[in-house]
Structures are given as C-alpha cells and as structure tokens.
C-alpha cells in the first residue's frame, strides 16, 4: 500500500474485514504516513510485523569524481493481520474515548 492520501486506517479496515489473515506491506516516505504507521501498529492486531528504513544513493559524475547523492529514505512496514473476532476500529474508538476522559494534562488535571 502506498499513496494512501491520509486514509491508511480506512483502507486497512476494509482489508481486515475482507480477510483478517491478510499479509500487508506499506511504503511510506512522508512524515504524515510514518505517523499513521504508529496508529496502525496500535490499532490492528498483527503478527510477524517488521519495519525497515531503506536509504538509497545515486552516484553522479562531477568532472573526474563520482559523488554519491542521497535520495529520500523509504520506510517499509509489513505484517500479517491476526483475527480477534472484534473490529479493531471499534476498539480504537473506545480507547480514544477513554483517553479523552482520563487523559492527564499539566499538573495531573483531567483533559477532555
């Protein structure tokens, strides 16, 4: 999965409902997608998860020198869904609601 346009959780929810044992591979280059990956890891039951960061350099010739120039890093996250019998998005919503009710603010005050 790549180029999710900020809808990664929605895409994965549909895939999980179709096959809760599916193998997933997600490519990420933007900080926004990398942040979404953290939410994915916290939301969906999974096994065999692996996260890689790959860096590639291209060699450019400058006069008599060959200089490596770094390209942007690519993150690759792979995992297999694990079936639990419940919808992971429902569990995530409940967790967010509970966090909103009991979240600690400055000096321990409750935030809503």
What residues fall within each predicted segment?
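A short, conserved alpha-helix within the catalytic core of class I
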Residues: 6-14
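Helical hairpin unit composed of two closely spaced alpha helices linked by a short loop
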Residues: 1-3
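C-terminal substrate-binding/active-site "lid" region of AdoMet-derived donor-dependent transferases
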Residues: 14-70
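A broadly conserved detector of short glycine/acidic/proline-rich loop/turn motifs that flank catalytic sites
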Residues: 5, 55, 83
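Core SAM-dependent methyltransferase catalytic element
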Residues: 65-96, 109-112
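Short, surface-exposed acidic/glycine-rich loop or hinge patches that mediate macromolecular interfaces
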Residues: 5-6, 31
